[in-house]
């Protein structure tokens, strides 16, 4: 298994992706597929959030390609290991090696779970399971109605049992459960928390803010989503 992992890294030039792959369409992608890292939970782990209900896969692939999305996912996992985890570890003075993921599933129905959206989610899930299986601490699925719960077995069947055991479905009153694990001021307003990231163009999911990037902001060419940062020299970048 480990040899397969090493061969994959060599074949895909993974070490180069982390520093050399420019995903310049990221801001357009986030409009169609809202997602991002945002602060930490009470254990000091990075929070990763997706508004999965807003994902339009057809529209997504008008601004990027599946191949580039795969490279982007791999790059972000590498940055999680080499940049975000070390920043979080330094902040809490102990090793942080897992993240907490939140997926907002509001409005997802049968067509989402059996069509293009499911294929896209499965693509992302396979990357995580095959090459970065230990990085997920917990995952919380928000706004899971009765239909979603009924169809959960379909999605779960594609997942590793160990990974599936880390996933918890919450209904519409999820905030009372989330605040057990995350300070409310670290939860974005878009999922009923108190953080607005008003200094970030686009809001919380454009911030990538946390101990690894205290000022927040995503650099794309000469543009930074932090309204107070003007150039690439101003932003904290992954090493």
Pin down the residues of each PLM region.
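Basic, amphipathic alpha-helical/coil surface patches used to engage anionic, phosphate-bearing ligands
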Residues: 1-239
């Amino acid at each position: 298994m480990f040899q397969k992992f090493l061969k994959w890294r060599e074949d895909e030039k993974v070490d180069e992706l982390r520093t050399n792959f420019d995903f310049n369409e990221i801001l357009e992608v986030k409009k169609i597929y809202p997602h991002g890292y945002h602060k930490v939970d009470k254990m000091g782990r990075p929070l990763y959030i997706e508004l999965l209900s807003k994902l339009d896969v057809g529209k997504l692939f008008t601004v990027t390609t599946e191949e580039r999305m795969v490279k982007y996912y791999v790059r972000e996992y590498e940055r999680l290991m080499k940049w975000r985890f070390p920043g979080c570890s330094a902040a809490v003075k102990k090793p942080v090696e897992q993240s907490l993921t939140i997926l907002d599933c509001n409005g997802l129905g049968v067509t989402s779970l059996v069509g293009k959206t499911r294929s896209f989610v499965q693509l992302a899930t396979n990357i995580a399971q095959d090459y970065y299986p230990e990085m997920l601490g917990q995952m919380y699925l928000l706004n899971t109605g009765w239909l979603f719960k009924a169809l959960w077995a379909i999605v779960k069947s594609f997942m590793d049992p160990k990974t599936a055991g880390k996933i918890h479905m919450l209904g519409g009153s999820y905030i009372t459960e989330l605040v057990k694990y995350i300070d409310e001021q670290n939860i974005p307003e878009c999922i009923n928390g108190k953080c607005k990231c008003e200094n970030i163009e686009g809001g919380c999911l454009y911030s990538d803010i946390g101990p690894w990037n205290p000022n927040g902001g995503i650099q794309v060419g000469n543009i930074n989503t932090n309204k107070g940062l003007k150039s690439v020299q101003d932003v904290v970048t992954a090493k």
